[in-house]
Amino acid sequence: MPLLKLDQVVIKDLGKKQYQETFSAMKDFVAKGEDESIWMLEHDPVFTLGTAADQKHILKRTDIDIFQADRGGEVTYHGPGQLVIYFLLNIKKRNLGPKKFVKQLEDLVQKTLLNFQIQSNTIEGSPGVYVDSKKIASIGLRFSKGYSYHGISINVDMDLDPFKNINPCGYEGLQVTQIKDIYSNITLEKVKSVVEKNIQQIF
């Protein structure tokens, strides 16, 4: 059974964008309440704080910008080599509750990882996708006037060192991983292609 149909939803590849610029664009898009879209992109290095974020989970201050976002969740890191996918969807029209939507996004990530022979799992109460207890994909969402925005980030082929400066998603000692460490012959473009195909098949 398909998770949901994405009739007339445009999937856009935005390349590399500053987080703050994209954050403003998302809010403007959703405020109009007219269309739906899915954006795929990379961000320049940035730590983002969710609405539940506690500053104590920033372990070391660096020259990487810190931005307070309005998504759910704690602190995370975005940077080049990580695929970020924002889902700007009318979930009210699609009759999707937050829990069901999160489950569908996790399913999308897991299906994508399987394309690269990577087995993964989810953890009840801790949204995201894990490989051998290491987090490979994060989920953070916001819902406003029946729309979703923000989305998921998948670690593909990136510098993971900045994660050492935080407790990722608010969990002390949580380790992170990426596709490159498990499936060496990988590029961001390959993952984008698989994600887009899976969106068309699953959603």
Model-derived regions: residue spans:
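N-terminal lobe of the biotin/lipoate ligase/transferase fold
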Residues: 1-136, 185-189
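Short, functional N-terminal and low-complexity linear motifs
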Residues: 73-79, 159-166
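Conserved, well-ordered active-site substructure
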Residues: 140
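A general nucleic-acid interaction/assembly signal
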Residues: 143-144
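Short conserved catalytic/interaction loops centered on acidic-Pro-aromatic/His motifs
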Residues: 120-123, 150, 161-166
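Conserved phosphate/anionic-ligand binding catalytic regions in large, soluble enzymes, centered on
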Residues: 147-155
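C-terminal accessory segment of soluble enzyme catalytic cores
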Residues: 160-203
